Amino acid sequence: MDSASRQHVALIAFPFASHPGNLFAFARALAAAAPDITFSFLTTTFAAATLPPAPPAANLRLCHVADGVPEGGLPPGTTIHGRIGMFLRATPGNFRDGVRAAEEEVGVKVSCVVSDAFLWMTADVAEEIGAQWLPLWTCAPAALLAHVSTDQLRERFGVEKQATAGWADELVDFIPGLSCLRIRDIPDEIVTNWHSDLSILLHRMGNQLTSATAVALNTFDGLDTTIDAALASLFKKTLPIGPLNLLSSPPPLQPGDEKCLSWLDGQEDATVAYVSFGTMVLMPTQSDVSEIAQGLESSGVRFLWSLREEARAGLLPPGFLERTAGRGLVVPWAPQVRVLGHRAVGAFVTHCGWNAVMESVTSGVPMACLPSFADQKTNARMVSAAWGIGEALRGEKVTKEEVVRSMEIVMMGEEGRRMRERIGNLREKAAEAVGPGGSSSENFKSVLEMVRGTAN
C-alpha cells in the first residue's frame, strides 16, 4: 500500500497515574481492529515504562515526547504535582515535535489525533495539521460532568477552601446528573485547589471538549442514564465505549502471583475482602495503614491485602501479621483483575479510582470505599448513594471503626447481599455492552469510522 492511501493516527497520552495504560488499552483495541492503519502512541519515557509488558501490535508504535524535566534531573523533593507542572509547561511544543517525528518515521501524515481528554491543547495540534481530534475521557462520567460545570459550581460556592467549608454537605441538585453529590464529593480542583496546574488544565479542558466532534467515554450504557443524558446534552456526540478493562485480556501472571491465587483457592465463596489502593496512588500515611489494619483485625473478616513493601515497613501495627496469619495474607502486589474475579472475594476495599470501580463492577464485587484525592470522592459517593453497590467512608479520615462498619455492611449484612445483587446486574449490562451488537461495541465501530475519516 503506497503512502498516499495509508492512514496514520497519533494517540497522545497524559503520562501520569493510570492514564497512559487506559489510552494504551484503547490504542491496542484500535490497532487490532484496523490492521491497515498505523498508530503512533506518544508518551514520555517514564510513562512508557509503566505500560503492559506484552508486545504491541505490528501497526502500533511507541514514540517518546519530552516530559519537561530539567536536564539535570528532578529537583530534590519534587512532588507528583510538580512533575505534572513541568510536563504541562513542555506542551504543546513536545506534542508538535512528537507528531512531526512520527510522520517522518512512518512516512505518512497524521490524519487523526486521539488524545487523553485532559490534554485539551491537542485540539490545536490536530487543527494545525488538518487532522480531526477525538478525546477519550478515561475517568468517571460524573467527574467529567462536574468539570464541564466548573464555572457554575464556582459561581455558586466560591473557590477558596474556607468559603466552601460551610457548603460541604450542600447537594449539587441544580446540575442535572449530579443531584446526589455534595460539595465535599466534588474534585478539589474545581472548588478549592483552583490555582494548581492541574486545576487550570481541567478547567480549560471542560471548555474545550464542547467543541470536539465526539467524546469517547470509559463507561457503558445503563450504568447511569441521568449522567449519560446530561453529557449528551453538553457535547456534540458522546461515545461510551467501556468498560476499557474489558477491551483486553488480563496481563499475564507474574512470578509470585500464584501465591495469593492459591491462597484464595482455599477460602470459601465471597468470604475474603480484597484490599488495594493501586500502584500509582500516593504513599499511604502511617495513620491510614494502621487504622485499616486495626479495622481488618477487629472485623474478623478474611482478607487479602496488596501493600507495597515500602508502605508496609514500619506502618503496620506491631504483631499484626502474626495475629492475623490464620485468616489474612499481605502481599506486595496482586493480579487485581484475576483476584476480583475469584469466587472467594466478596468485597473490594479501595480508594475508588475509576479503574478500580470498573474492575469491581465487571467482576460483580461490591466496594468499601476509602477515597483520598482526585475524583475518588466523587466515585465513592456514586458507588454508595447513587448505585447502591458499596459503602463509603463517613467523615474525612480513615478510622478503625469505619473499616469495621464497612466490613459489617458489605460482607455480613442484608444490605451487602443487596449490593451484590445490584452490582451483579451492572456486571451483566457491562458484558452486554461490549458483546456482539452491544452499545459499546457499536460505539467502538463509530470511533473506527471517525479514525478512518468515513463517519457521517
Curated annotation (Swiss-Prot):
Pathway: Flavonoid metabolism. Expressed in young cromes. It is an enzyme of class 2 (transferase). Keywords: Glycosyltransferase, Transferase. InterPro entries: UDP_glucos_trans, UDP_glycos_trans_CS. The active site is at 19 (proton acceptor), 116 (charge relay). UDP-beta-L-rhamnose binds at residues 279, 334, 351, 355, 359. It catalyses: myricetin + UDP-beta-L-rhamnose = myricetin 3-O-alpha-L-rhamnoside + UDP + H(+). GO terms for molecular function: quercetin 3-O-glucosyltransferase activity; quercetin 7-O-glucosyltransferase activity. Its EC number is 2.4.1.-. Belongs to the UDP-glycosyltransferase family. This is Myricetin 3-O-rhamnosyltransferase UGT77B2.
